[in-house]
Amino acid sequence: KFSEQNVLKENFTKNRNILLLIGHLRTIKYLLKYHKKFLVKTNSDLIISTWTDDETDDKTFELIKEKLNPVYFEIEEFNFNSTVDIFGNLNKFDLMFGKASLSTRSQIYKFSKSLHLIEKIEYLQNKKYEIIFKSRPDLLFFSNINLHISDKSIFFENTIGDWNRDRSDRFFYGKRDIYFSFIKIL
């Protein structure tokens, strides 16, 4: 659920694009300067939607807020039942398949939730973002980002994983409407 207490209105800007950092924070504190460069280079605001973990302390949360100026920053406790709305009751057998299955499930939940977060932040700022970038907080960007893109294309990072076998869900981006369409069919 969207929470007003996670909105950081003091960080609202006129930026045209938005970066979603979704997933566990892990090593983000070592990547803050790179994320900041990305935000500046792409004229992007930032939404962070992460999970609680045993590794991240309050100092790291404050450092992220100070260095990256997110417009929305939420930290959720993972709740398997919150994913039932997306997957349905018949898919509860995922609990039997261990961490990988739960990780995928939580990732799809965050993808779906991100649409709602973007819409709420857009509403609060009375604007619509042009390009939406999605990544994990613990990843470094290697791609040269092209901001002059087609309305009908989604671009996937090609430096992570075996590009011949699969497409990375770790970093991708596209214009707002195609991004929303893509996430809705996941």
Task: Describe the predicted segments one by one.
Residues K1-L186:
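ER/Golgi luminal nucleotide-sugar-dependent glycosyltransferases, focusing on the catalytic module
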